[in-house]
Amino acid sequence: MEFKLEEHFNKTFVTENNTAAARNAAFPAWEDYRGSVDDLQYFLIGLYTFVSLLGFMGNLLILMAVMKKRNQKTTVNFLIGNLAFSDILVVLFCSPFTLTSVLLDQWMFGKAMCHIMPFLQCVSVLVSTLILISIAIVRYHMIKHPISNNLTANHGYFLIATVWTLGFAICSPLPVFHSLVELKETFGSALLSSKYLCVESWPSDSYRIAFTISLLLVQYILPLVCLTVSHTSVCRSISCGLSHKENRLEENEMINLTLQPSKKSRNQAKTPSTQKWSYSFIRKHRRRYSKKTACVLPAPAGPSQGKHLAVPENPASVRSQLSPSSKVIPGVPICFEVKPEESSDAHEMRVKRSITRIKKRSRSVFYRLTILILVFAVSWMPLHVFHVVTDFNDNLISNRHFKLVYCICHLLGMMSCCLNPILYGFLNNGIKADLRALIHCLHMS
């Protein structure tokens, strides 16, 4: 992520004392590239400021929302919180130092920062990318093993510790192979006195190319493969579950059409209500009545006392006092209200509505995951292609437009820090409610 001006001008910086002549021969004239972004410097300042503020505020909101409910956090939300933290580091370490080096054409932060800052830039970007891989792996595990025990907080801590360890290990060569080069010594101009460049000084081209290829594999190709495999598995699982429900609904419809008689024949074959209620009440109808709506009919007074209770002589007068769904059992002075039965048509309609909702959600998940993959691929591809091209054939980019092309590629990479809070936070149902509550609290305060 650091400004690799030296890659365009000198491919090999041998760390011996007799390299001044080689550097003078390798570097072009200072005026050839000095004014490459002069016409757009204010535009670049505004664009970098906008992207940096947007990325910083978005990731800060995600981090605050995750920390607000840290006692109820899941493994995915824990990883998303760490992703927001690493993206904040990317914004803080990459944007200001890169923009300053591009616009001022020199390194102004001292020799110690020349060794430290490229290392921190590389670690922050690499950790952010490795956390994306971890989120993809966790989602893949949840889809493939839904019945197994959920991942605990200890698994999240282990993943984060592994990610940061790998980040420090992979980027460890950068502090060693960076040095501060004086421009006066390099270009032989008195106007460039007291101006320095922070450049990579690898022992040979093979070391530099090997490091560039390793970063390409770890920071771009491997995450892209993991994201694609994980999200394809998620979409496939949702699609398989949806098709299974549709097939089961079609089978039920075929069984109903084949075995059930028509509504007209069923109405003709209906038995009278009183006869129906006199048949095996306990065996057939015990589940159709609600205990909450049971009521006891008043028993007639007088000579009927001490005898078996019977239904009043005029049951119509009693039934008129009850709800329309109530039934009177002959010979038993108790009334129950029948539970409403769901017809097969209503059940089918409910299942169809459920399938429609699942289809809508599956399309939403598919679009969101596809956009997530495309955002990562499009935002980081130009910068990695730029580094590979400048390592193998720097003549493809002219001296004057070198810094401008680099700024465009670098800004596209920085855009991922602005879009990650939206894709992983604001579109995440587990974090969306917390974000709304947090924004409301901030607005009220």
Curated annotation (Swiss-Prot):
<feature type="disulfide bond">
    <location>
        <begin position="114"/>
        <end position="198"/>
    </location>
</feature>
<dbReference type="GO" id="GO:0003151">
    <property type="term" value="P:outflow tract morphogenesis"/>
</dbReference>
<feature type="transmembrane region" description="Helical; Name=7">
    <location>
        <begin position="407"/>
        <end position="427"/>
    </location>
</feature>
<feature type="topological domain" description="Cytoplasmic">
    <location>
        <begin position="139"/>
        <end position="156"/>
    </location>
</feature>
<dbReference type="GO" id="GO:0002865">
    <property type="term" value="P:negative regulation of acute inflammatory response to antigenic stimulus"/>
</dbReference>
<keyword id="KW-0675">Receptor</keyword>
<feature type="topological domain" description="Cytoplasmic">
    <location>
        <begin position="428"/>
        <end position="445"/>
    </location>
</feature>
<feature type="transmembrane region" description="Helical; Name=3">
    <location>
        <begin position="118"/>
        <end position="138"/>
    </location>
</feature>
<dbReference type="GO" id="GO:0005886">
    <property type="term" value="C:plasma membrane"/>
</dbReference>
<feature type="topological domain" description="Extracellular">
    <location>
        <begin position="178"/>
        <end position="208"/>
    </location>
</feature>
<dbReference type="GO" id="GO:0098982">
    <property type="term" value="C:GABA-ergic synapse"/>
</dbReference>
<dbReference type="GO" id="GO:0014050">
    <property type="term" value="P:negative regulation of glutamate secretion"/>
</dbReference>
<dbReference type="GO" id="GO:0098793">
    <property type="term" value="C:presynapse"/>
</dbReference>
<dbReference type="GO" id="GO:0007186">
    <property type="term" value="P:G protein-coupled receptor signaling pathway"/>
</dbReference>
<comment type="similarity">
    <text>Belongs to the G-protein coupled receptor 1 family.</text>
</comment>
<dbReference type="GO" id="GO:0043005">
    <property type="term" value="C:neuron projection"/>
</dbReference>
<feature type="transmembrane region" description="Helical; Name=4">
    <location>
        <begin position="157"/>
        <end position="177"/>
    </location>
</feature>
<dbReference type="InterPro" id="IPR000393">
    <property type="entry name" value="NPY5_rcpt"/>
</dbReference>
<feature type="glycosylation site" description="N-linked (GlcNAc...) asparagine">
    <location>
        <position position="17"/>
    </location>
</feature>
<keyword id="KW-1133">Transmembrane helix</keyword>
<dbReference type="GO" id="GO:0048661">
    <property type="term" value="P:positive regulation of smooth muscle cell proliferation"/>
</dbReference>
<dbReference type="GO" id="GO:0016020">
    <property type="term" value="C:membrane"/>
</dbReference>
<keyword id="KW-0325">Glycoprotein</keyword>
<feature type="transmembrane region" description="Helical; Name=6">
    <location>
        <begin position="369"/>
        <end position="389"/>
    </location>
</feature>
<feature type="topological domain" description="Extracellular">
    <location>
        <begin position="99"/>
        <end position="117"/>
    </location>
</feature>
<dbReference type="GO" id="GO:0002675">
    <property type="term" value="P:positive regulation of acute inflammatory response"/>
</dbReference>
<dbReference type="GO" id="GO:0007268">
    <property type="term" value="P:chemical synaptic transmission"/>
</dbReference>
<feature type="transmembrane region" description="Helical; Name=2">
    <location>
        <begin position="78"/>
        <end position="98"/>
    </location>
</feature>
<feature type="glycosylation site" description="N-linked (GlcNAc...) asparagine">
    <location>
        <position position="10"/>
    </location>
</feature>
<dbReference type="GO" id="GO:0032229">
    <property type="term" value="P:negative regulation of synaptic transmission, GABAergic"/>
</dbReference>
<keyword id="KW-1015">Disulfide bond</keyword>
<feature type="transmembrane region" description="Helical; Name=1">
    <location>
        <begin position="43"/>
        <end position="63"/>
    </location>
</feature>
<feature type="topological domain" description="Cytoplasmic">
    <location>
        <begin position="230"/>
        <end position="368"/>
    </location>
</feature>
<dbReference type="GO" id="GO:0003214">
    <property type="term" value="P:cardiac left ventricle morphogenesis"/>
</dbReference>
<feature type="topological domain" description="Extracellular">
    <location>
        <begin position="390"/>
        <end position="406"/>
    </location>
</feature>
<dbReference type="GO" id="GO:0060112">
    <property type="term" value="P:generation of ovulation cycle rhythm"/>
</dbReference>
<keyword id="KW-0472">Membrane</keyword>
<feature type="lipid moiety-binding region" description="S-palmitoyl cysteine">
    <location>
        <position position="441"/>
    </location>
</feature>
<keyword id="KW-0812">Transmembrane</keyword>
<keyword id="KW-0449">Lipoprotein</keyword>
<dbReference type="InterPro" id="IPR017452">
    <property type="entry name" value="GPCR_Rhodpsn_7TM"/>
</dbReference>
<dbReference type="Pfam" id="PF00001">
    <property type="entry name" value="7tm_1"/>
</dbReference>
